[in-house]
Amino acid sequence: MALYRQILLGFIILVSVVALAGCGSEPLPQPPLIHESGQVTQVDDVFGTFYVYVPTSMPKQQQILVLVHGTPAKEESAEETAHYYIVNWVDFAEEHGYLLIVPAFNQENFSSRYGDIALSGYRGLFGREINADEWVLRLVRAYQQAFAAPEEQFYLYGHSAGGQFVARFLVTHADAIKRAVISSAATYPQPTTGVAWPFGMGELHADIEWDAATSKHVDIIPDKQVWLAATQVPLTVLVGLNDTDELSGYPGQKGKNRFTIGHNWVKDMVAFAQENGLESRFKTEIIPGKGHSMSGLIPYSQQALTTP
């Protein structure tokens, strides 16, 4: 299967933890499937909560759009943040027939609130019990089996920390994505082996500490060919012209704010493709009068997802 091959080839990930579905144990149940249309439904999977919206009028070939939320606001849970995202995209899903899946990356298992611990948590595709990218693929596969072709590519959108997830998912699972949009991300995986994952294409061999009692070892070897394949996926990086707050320095990032960091990353990915005989399909759109606002950039994000 294409997605399965991509997981094996995209990264070599060795995880020193006891598997949830180990030898002799019961197999993991499939994620619950929601068939009712026209309503936002909260669903509880073994790895966390996610939200689903099934459009009332579905095309013959169902298209899945995964929305990845940003860092939850103070006093707001990941579940509340994910719910806010999906309700803001319902009209778009109805108009274009997208089935929406919105995972809630909570603090305990995905470090959603703190990007400076657990190697940035879900932003870097990491997770305590299941890696963040693997959870998304688990949910998508289940709904592809129920509503669409199992091998069908899907659409991916993320804002802020969710945009960081999208960038790293893309260079890990390039053949899974039909089109992607990143809105106002602060960091990106740079196309250089001189910077270690999740901030670059260099190898990562590290222990991730989730809490005092839980440590997870990872050995990650990014695959240059998958990164090159990622440059062939249509991707739009959106940043508001007023999104100029100075950010903390992270390895490999070129710039001090989301505006310059995003612009320079696309520029470097285009050059990376050209150096290897390819023409990148990445582009940047700078939106005048907009700051760091998911809702303010939604019309531009939605247009980018539907414009050839």
Model-assigned labels for residue ranges:
Residues 67-70, 102, 237:
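Structural cue for short, hydrophobic secondary-structure segments
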Residues 1-11:
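Bacterial N-terminal signal peptides that target proteins for export
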Residues 23-64, 72, 76, 84, ...:
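A domain-start/cap signature at the N-terminus of enzymes
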